[in-house]
Amino acid sequence: MELHVNNEQTGLGSWSYSWSSGAGRGSCSSLVADGIPTYEPDAKVDSLHARPRIYFLRDQRPRVQSFRAYSELDENGWTTGPAERIRARLSRVRQDGEVVAWKLRFRTEVVDERYFDLDVSFEKLDRRCGDNGEASYAFGLERE
């Protein structure tokens, strides 16, 4: 996954995820990981009204389950205070007629720093396995 702001990009990793896939004839395997989110500013924005883009570098359509922004972190580094629901638009990225990625566009105001929580799910990664893929991302934007 990549975050694009001000014509610059940075990679974003998930801090929590679960994936299921086929593991041979009639069986499935799952991979689950859980960590601690870090909201270190991943990118600097040069104006109050930012228009970041997030690219999911896979052909499966992500479904945004929750996307929230916060202005504060507590003493332990967790988001605190009122949350703002972020509205975003999702579009396909095509190359030679094939979907190669999905672009999530959103607008936000960055006065000083903003901290974001994004939870997504993906349609069945393997039709033989009933679980969807899920991932949680945390990132920050900082005003220059």
Regions found by a protein language model. Give the residues of each.
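N-terminal export/targeting and maturation segments
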Residues: 1-24
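Beta-strand-rich interaction surfaces with strong enrichment in secreted/lumenal proteins
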Residues: 42-45, 91, 105-107
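Short beta-strand segments within Ig-like beta-sandwich modules, predominantly Fibronectin type-III
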Residues: 90-100
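Internal, hydrophobic beta-strand segments that form the core of beta-sheet-rich folds
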Residues: 111-125
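Short beta-strand elements
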Residues: 125-144
